[in-house]
């Protein structure tokens, strides 16, 4: 077998007939498959053992040779080679065709490659291939020119002869008529008899004349056609062609079907055609030039790749190995077979029939019909349904052809190559495991035994509990008691991977150390639920076992849950306490008045705990407490002995126990937000392992006090504010007043609607405030909402105050409010209007999931080959960013959105303060601390490095990318940052709303939002309701003549004025990015400025303002959508995708390079070609950047394997084959498809041959992971979990 890791490129091309025969192990001559009685393959049939190999290992067909000792012998009786049966998965056969057929991909694809090459319209080509017209394949011009005078003379002679014959026939008939008339007169016949005879004769005369004229016309037509006959002319008139052939057959050749096309391709001169087309491109213009460019692409492809154009016509068809198109017997004795077998049978049947007809010398028309049917059979084998009606099987289902085997989700690429089912895996329902440590998971014993079976068996044999592997296997299957002890030993230190579908981002698969548990459900640590998006309402998870030491090391170092605390999308902690844990922390840190023990002072925490245990002190009572070794929260004085006296509560002191000693004392109420901030601070200053330790403690204390708090929910906790009736009465009066004004005609329908919405929004707000004021601090529901454990004030309002205004399915707000709340119950009408809009929400969610998944797939595809390839590309370019603004009092305040714009990037240039001192050096990582330092030094503008300005030849460099958000330090070389970017953008996609919101029926206001807006931006589509942009700087003039409104831009540069026709309802007064703009007569605008309310088209921004502006515009617009949903995504992720969208350049003028005008070229290749041209003293090419949508950009990738596995498989493969494309395997997908290690992370050369050597301290500490300190007494370890810094992992850690 070929080792996939030892080749580095893969080429595709057109297979010639000789190559197909060379692959083949024999010709398939019969359509038979399996003998229904013996169930053995028929000889020379589609499953023949002689061709494809034996069906049983080491056994020939007739049974003469059995056993492995005859390996390699070919049986002289049946001709079958004695070998393994799995050769039936790789051995191919072939069908030798009696007549050639064209390959449907090259003829019927869009555009038709055959049509472009030969310059024939596809419908004309179809006529030739399917025997409806003849094609002239060769003309002997020289002989025709030489013999033309003599031939013309012959034709003239023939013509004269025809005329003479006509004249003599006419004369003879007239004489006969006269004789007949004379005879009738002599006989005294009646006048009408005479007239009848005369009429009959005249008819006959006319008939003679028309017949003769037809022969003369036919002769003229044949002669004219022959005189002007050119190669590749089509002739659909069979009679005319036959006559021409019989008269002038030696001067030309013509035929029908694929034979004609093959002959043409054989004689086709690619070089001269290429020169002719280049000449047309230089001199021609318009349609002619465009067509020449398209044709040159195909001609040049054949010249460059060395493919033979004749290979597009097949003389033999390959037959794929039988095990790839199996036939299996069902229970009832019937057979289930792959559709391919039926399609192959049709080809073989028609081929054999054609052979018989040719041998019999059947008439041409019958042979041609059979050839056409053979062509159709091969077409449907290659791509069923591409032309005409698809061949269907039982139940009218179209049969799956070879193309269908590759295409779509169930095709070979996506089903079997990019995703496979694996062994050493299992799945089960998950339940919560609150007792687990963060790096642990609970694995059911029976499941673990099955997963670790080989390890257990080996260990049983090593410990001599079993004599051999077979008896060890038996012991495992019978579950002997000793097996469980061995299992316990085997699983120690062996991580397993847990995965929850859908795996939307890298945190969907994490490694844990398994703990054996009883039962059948997997136990999951509560803090990792948010990363997996898991809950315990019946979710299932899959377990996978890393087998090799390398895989185990990667799982432990890179994937262990304690090393995945940060979210790759924004670099903030994802493993945060939630639900009961928040309630526990909230209850613990509450300080209430009037509790037992209030005002007392305690000398130590132990004393306070003792008082609490004796019932003298309540947990939330305000007390004075003396504590040692803490960081005071405010400016309390530290006494000489290092102690501080604090105003606090026992609960707060207990809460601070779980935090590190050097963390400032927490003396405030802790809810979800506060815990988030605490963990965020800790993750900035501590290692992930230490943070995991703190998180575990927070979880334990949260659960403990959550239980002790006794928080419950009852209907009595829902308290409707007593002032509700009078609050509503006041607003009802205002609403009635608006209605009266409307009835009088004082306000319009729209104004009334807006007023009512305004009134009832205010009413809801006031009632909500009254409700909040009505809750006591210890009200359980209020505690849940206020702490952030569950629910929100909006939900609370609907239960306790009033439901308020609701939207209808279109997204418009219904101006009638729902005054009841759920506690009181809704009226029938109120219930109806509230469900009306609610249903739309449900349907939306279902649609959103699919759309979001598809967006993620496209994003992954476009960015999959962006990998960090080098440490520093050395560029000095960067993106300017504002980090602070003046608040009006001379103080700098931090701007919004720094977390996603500047945080975790590298500085591009030294940040210097007003005195010229360097505050932060270039290439420094910008964390929260550095940003605060810059603002404190009075710096408001900095320049940061970005992937958009990175100059790395492939992928990007570590400095331009900055900090890896999931590890918290500079990104490693080899990190697949493109995939991380795609996951980070796609993962929150499902949360984004689908709807287009109407704020109140104002035209132009229904701007696309949510997921459709993100798709619109990434696909670079022209937006709905797009606004024109100023083509250049100048002054606007508004022209309202001709019954339409025009904006005329009078340009400053003196060029022609630009006119923009805008709708009458267009808003010329609008807000854009926080500034109010008014477009009126005489207003001055800058180039690229928006001229009316709406959305700018990114293509226009690129054309007018250039690449940098369109990059900024796209980043800003995508961020806008995610920010409205509160999903923080770092800008570097969006930048990676945008960089991929702007990777291509359209060549306008080729200069002295090999590139063709109109060709799409990769930016790097374009710049390299230009540098080469200039170095050789030539002219560089001219081009302009292109903004491609992500789908188009994915298909335009250099890798044909990656593009084919994405979309339009047949089209991509057709193009790649003609161009003889080579895939250099630099991206991830192509390597996954081929089963190679991916060129990212540990798959890079650097890490391939690396050995992991633990230090002495790490070896000692390694055994202390799961024990308490008193459990061991060896080594020099500290008893902490393995400190990863001590492991010498190269660049991995």
UniProtKB/Swiss-Prot annotation:
Keyword list, A-Z: DNA-directed RNA polymerase, Magnesium, Metal-binding, Nucleotidyltransferase, Transcription, Transferase, Zinc
Domain of life: Bacteria
Coiled coil: none
CDD domains assigned to the protein according to its UniProt record, in alphabetical order: RNAP_beta'_C, RNAP_beta'_N
Residues that, per the record, bind Mg(2+): 535, 537, 539
Any one Gene Ontology cellular component term annotated for this protein: DNA-directed RNA polymerase complex
Co-factor: note: Binds 1 Mg(2+) ion per subunit. Binds 2 Zn(2+) ions per subunit.
Residue ranges crossing the lipid bilayer per the database entry: none
UniProt-listed Enzyme Commission number(s): 2.7.7.6
Gene Ontology terms describing biological process: DNA-templated transcription
GO molecular function, one term: DNA binding
Binding-site residues for Zn(2+) 1, renumbered to this chain: 60, 62, 75, 78
Residues that hold Zn(2+) 2 according to the record: 873, 950, 957, 960
Catalytically driven reaction(s): RNA(n) + a ribonucleoside 5'-triphosphate = RNA(n+1) + diphosphate
CC cofactor: Mg(2+); Zn(2+)
Assigned protein family: Belongs to the RNA polymerase beta' chain family.
Quaternary data: The RNAP catalytic core consists of 2 alpha, 1 beta, 1 beta' and 1 omega subunit. When a sigma factor is associated with the core the holoenzyme is formed, which can initiate transcription.
Reported function: DNA-dependent RNA polymerase catalyzes the transcription of DNA into RNA using the four ribonucleoside triphosphates as substrates.
Name of the protein: DNA-directed RNA polymerase subunit beta'
């Amino acid at each position: 077998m070929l080792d996939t890791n030892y080749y580095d490129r893969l080429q595709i091309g057109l297979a010639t007939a000789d190559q197909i025969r060379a692959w083949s192990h024999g010709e398939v001559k019969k359509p038979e498959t399996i003998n229904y009685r013996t169930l053995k393959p028929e000889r020379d049939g589609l499953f023949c053992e002689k061709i494809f190999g034996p069906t049983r290992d080491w056994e020939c067909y007739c049974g003469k040779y059995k056993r492995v000792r005859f390996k390699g012998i070919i049986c002289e009786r049946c001709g079958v080679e004695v070998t393994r049966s799995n050769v039936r998965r790789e051995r191919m056969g072939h069908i030798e065709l009696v007549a050639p057929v064209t390959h449907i991909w090259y003829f019927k694809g869009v555009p038709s490659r055959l049509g472009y090459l030969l310059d024939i319209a596809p419908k004309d080509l179809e006529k030739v291939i399917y025997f409806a017209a003849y094609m002239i394949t060769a003309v002997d011009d020289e002989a025709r020119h030489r013999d033309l005078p003599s031939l013309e003379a012959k034709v003239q002679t023939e013509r004269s002869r025809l005329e003479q014959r006509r004249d003599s026939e006419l004369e003879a008939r007239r004489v006969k008529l006269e004789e007949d008339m004379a005879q009738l007169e002599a006989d005294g016949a009646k006048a009408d008899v005479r007239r009848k005879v005369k009429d009959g004769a005249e008819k006959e005369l006319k008939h003679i004349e028309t017949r003769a004229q037809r022969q003369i016309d036919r002769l003229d037509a044949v002669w004219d056609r022959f005189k002007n006959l050119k190669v590749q002319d089509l002739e659909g008139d069979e009679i005319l062609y036959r006559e021409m052939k019989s008269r002038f057959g030696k001067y030309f050749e013509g035929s029908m079907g694929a034979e004609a096309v093959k002959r043409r391709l054989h004689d086709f001169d690619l070089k001269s055609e290429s020169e002719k087309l280049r000449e047309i491109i230089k001199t021609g213009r318009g349609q002619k030039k465009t067509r020449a460019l398209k044709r040159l692409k195909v001609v040049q492809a054949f010249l460059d790749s060395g493919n033979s154009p004749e290979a597009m016509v097949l003389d033999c068809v390959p037959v794929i190995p039988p095990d790839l198109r199996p036939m299996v017997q069902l229970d009832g004795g019937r057979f289930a077979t792959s559709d391919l077998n039926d399609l192959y049978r049709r080809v073989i049947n028609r081929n054999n029939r054609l052979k018989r007809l040719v041998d019999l010398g059947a008439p041409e028309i019958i042979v041609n019909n059979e050839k056409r049917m053979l062509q159709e059979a091969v077409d449907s084998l290659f791509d069923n349904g591409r032309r005409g009606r698809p061949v269907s099987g039982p139940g009218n289902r179209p049969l799956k052809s070879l193309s269908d085997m590759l295409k779509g989700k169930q095709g070979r690429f996506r089903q079997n190559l990019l995703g496979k089912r694996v062994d050493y895996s299992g799945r089960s329902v998950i339940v919560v495991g609150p007792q687990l440590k963060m790096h642990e998971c609970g694995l059911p014993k029976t499941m673990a035994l099955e997963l670790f079976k080989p390890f257990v068996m080996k260990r049983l044999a090593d410990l001599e509990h079993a004599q051999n592997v077979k008896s060890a296997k038996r012991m495992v299957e019978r579950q002997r008691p000793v097996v469980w002890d061995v299992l316990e030993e085997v699983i120690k230190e062996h991580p397993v991977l847990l995965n929850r579908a859908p795996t939307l981002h890298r945190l969907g698969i994490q490694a844990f150390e398994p703990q054996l548990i009883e039962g059948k459900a997997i136990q999951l640590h509560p803090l990792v639920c948010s990363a997996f998006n898991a809950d315990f309402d019946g979710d299932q998870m899959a377990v996978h076992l890393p087998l090799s030491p390398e895989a185990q090391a990667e799982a432990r170092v890179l994937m262990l849950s304690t090393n995945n605390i940060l979210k790759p999308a924004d670099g903030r902690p994802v493993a945060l306490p939630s639900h009961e844990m928040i309630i526990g922390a909230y209850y613990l840190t509450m300080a209430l008045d009037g509790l037992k023990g209030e005002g007392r002072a305690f000398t130590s925490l132990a004393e306070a705990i003792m008082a609490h245990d004796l019932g003298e002190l309540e947990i939330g009572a305000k007390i004075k407490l003396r504590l040692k070794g803490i960081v005071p929260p405010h400016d309390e004085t530290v006494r000489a002995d290092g102690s501080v006296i604090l105003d606090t509560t026992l609960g707060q002191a207990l809460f601070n126990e779980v935090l590190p000693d050097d963390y400032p004392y927490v003396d405030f109420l802790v809810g979800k937000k506060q815990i988030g901030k605490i963990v965020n601070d800790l993750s900035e200053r501590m290692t992930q392992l230490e943070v995991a330790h703190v998180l575990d403690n927070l979880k334990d204390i949260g659960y403990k006090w959550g239980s002790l708090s006794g928080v419950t929910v009852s209907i009595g906790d829902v308290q409707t504010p007593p002032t509700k009736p009078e609050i509503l009465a006041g607003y009802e009066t205002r609403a009635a007043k608006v209605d009266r004004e409307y009835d009088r005609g004082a306000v319009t329908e729209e104004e009334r609607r807006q007023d009512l919405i305004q009134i009832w929004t205010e009413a809801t707000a006031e009632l909500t405030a009254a409700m909040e004021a009505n809750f006591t601090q210890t009200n359980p529901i209020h505690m849940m909402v206020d702490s952030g454990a569950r629910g929100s004030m909006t939900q609370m309002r609907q239960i306790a105050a009033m439901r308020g205004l609701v939207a209808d399915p279109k997204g418009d707000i219904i101006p009638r409010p729902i005054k009841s709340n759920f506690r009181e119950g809704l009226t029938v009408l109120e219930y109806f209007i509230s469900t009306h809009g609610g249903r739309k929400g449900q349907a939306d969610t279902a649609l959103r999931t699919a759309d979001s998944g598809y967006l993620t797939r496209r994003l992954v595809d476009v960015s999959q080959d962006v990998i960090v390839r080098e440490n520093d590309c050395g560029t000095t370019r960067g993106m300017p960013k504002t980090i602070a603004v003046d608040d009006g009092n001379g103080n700098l305040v931090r701007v919004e959105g720094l977390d996603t714009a500047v945080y975790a990037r590298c500085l591009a240039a030294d940040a210097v303060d007003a005195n010229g001192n360097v505050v932060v050096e270039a290439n420094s990582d910008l964390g929260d601390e550095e940003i605060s330092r810059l603002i404190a030094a009075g710096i408001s503008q900095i320049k940061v490095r970005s992937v958009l300005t990175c100059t790395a030849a492939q992928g990007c460099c570590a400095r331009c990318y900055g900090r890896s958000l999931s590890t918290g330090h500079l990104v490693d070389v080899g990190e697949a940052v493109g995939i991380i970017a795609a996951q980070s953008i796609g993962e929150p996609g499902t949360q984004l709303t689908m709807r287009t919101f109407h704020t109140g029926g104002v035209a132009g206001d229904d701007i696309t939002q949510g997921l459709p807006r993100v798709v619109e931006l990434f696909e670079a589509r022209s937006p709905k309701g797009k606004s024109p942009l100023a083509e250049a700087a100048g002054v606007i003039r508004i022209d309202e003549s001709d019954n339409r409104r025009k904006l005329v831009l009078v340009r400053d540069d003196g060029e022609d004025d630009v006119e923009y026709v805008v709708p009458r309802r267009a808003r010329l007064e609008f807000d854009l990015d926080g500034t109010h703009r008014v477009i009126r007569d005489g207003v001055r605008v800058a180039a690229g400025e928006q001229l009316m309310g709406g959305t700018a088209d990114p293509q226009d921004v690129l054309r007018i303002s250039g690449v940098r502006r369109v990059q900024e515009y796209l980043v800003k617009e995508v961020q806008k959508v995610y920010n409205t949903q509160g999903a923080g995504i770092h800008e570097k992720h969006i930048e990676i995708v945008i960089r991929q969208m702007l990777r291509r350049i359209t060549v306008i003028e080729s200069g002295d390079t090999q590139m063709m005008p109109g060709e799409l070229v990769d930016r790097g290749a374009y710049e390299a070609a230009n540098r080469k041209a200039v170095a050789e003293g030539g002219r560089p090419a001219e081009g302009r950047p292109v903004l491609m949508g992500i789908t188009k950009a994915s298909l335009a990738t250099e890798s044909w394997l990656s593009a084919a596995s994405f979309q339009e498989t047949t089209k991509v493969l057709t193009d790649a084959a003609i161009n003889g494309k080579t895939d250099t395997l630099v991206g991830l997908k192509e390597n996954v498809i081929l089963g190679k290690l991916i060129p990212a992370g540990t798959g890079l050369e650097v890490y391939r041959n690396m050995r992991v050597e633990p230090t002495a301290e790490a070896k000692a500490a390694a055994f202390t992971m799961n024990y308490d300190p008193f459990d061991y007494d060896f080594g020099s370890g500290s008893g902490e979990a393995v400190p990863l810094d001590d492991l010498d992992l190269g660049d991995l850690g």
